[in-house]
């Protein structure tokens, strides 16, 4: 009797780890799709953006960016700041992703908070190829988000309901993300950096001009304090 291929064994091992992620990604993705559709975009916007960007927080923000006047510098800095934590994820995964061959570029591209957490902590069973395990965790997580965003975009055009105030979902999402990170962290290192920089720049530059200075301050602080932040990040997922 032939034994299972390493890829098939890896898929069967990876899938159970992604089931909790499906619950979150699918419904949040649907919310994003509906939000995009009610903001005036066709369903293929969230469908394509969920694959090309694959960053939930950035995709929500991108909706308002697409509706705002063209400001490439602010868009670039905003994107860098929102996704900056991935720099530390990437550094932490250098050894684990070593030797994964052609899969490595996709593993780097598809890394998100949940994928990082699973791939960093999972104990890969014997007989399952390590590279394929990481690949299927990443692929399944992205598929869940893609599926939710696409269905949300389609349903958002079919359903007729009062969407007034739906744009507040983005504000609520960032508040929930901040609170979740605050509760998970013991040191609140990065949270304090963000709070102090935001309040200081708001007072110095005013509500209309504080965003870019805040992002620059946070980026500089996180870069300068990379080693302690990276160490705390690794402790949080162990």
Question: At which residue positions do the language-model features occur?
Answer:
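Short, Lys/Arg-rich, polar N-terminal cytosolic tail immediately upstream
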Residues: 1-13
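Helical membrane-embedded segments and adjacent short helical loop/helix-boundary regions
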Residues: 11-28, 41-47, 52-55, 160, ...
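Helix-loop-helix junctions within the multi-pass membrane cores of secondary transporters/permeases
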Residues: 2-3, 76-167
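Alpha-helical transmembrane segments and their membrane-interface exit regions
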Residues: 57, 81-88, 173-179, 198-200, ...
């Amino acid at each position: 009797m032939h034994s299972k291929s390493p890829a098939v064994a890896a898929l069967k091992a990876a899938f159970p780890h992604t089931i909790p992620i499906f619950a979150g990604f699918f419904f949040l993705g649907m919310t994003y799709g509906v939000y995009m559709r009610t903001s005036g975009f066709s369903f293929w916007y969230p469908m394509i953006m969920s694959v090309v960007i694959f960053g939930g927080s950035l995709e929500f923000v991108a909706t308002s960016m697409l509706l705002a006047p063209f400001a490439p510098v602010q868009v670039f800095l905003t994107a860098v700041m929102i996704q900056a934590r991935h720099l530390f994820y990437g550094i932490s995964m250098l050894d684990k992703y070593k030797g994964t061959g052609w899969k490595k570029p996709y593993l780097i591209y598809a890394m998100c908070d949940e994928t990082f957490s699973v791939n960093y902590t999972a104990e890969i069973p014997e007989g399952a190829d390590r590279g394929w395990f990481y690949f299927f965790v990443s692929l399944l997580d992205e598929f869940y988000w893609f599926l939710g965003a696409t269905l949300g975009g389609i349903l958002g055009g079919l359903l007729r309901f009062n969407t007034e105030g739906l744009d507040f979902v983005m504000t609520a999402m960032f508040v929930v993300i901040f609170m979740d990170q605050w509760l998970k962290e013991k040191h609140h290192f990065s949270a304090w950096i963000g709070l102090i920089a935001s309040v200081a720049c708001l007072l110095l530059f005013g509500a209309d001009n504080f965003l870019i200075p805040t992002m620059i301050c946070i980026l500089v602080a996180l870069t300068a304090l990379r080693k302690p932040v990276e160490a705390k990040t690794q402790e949080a997922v162990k």
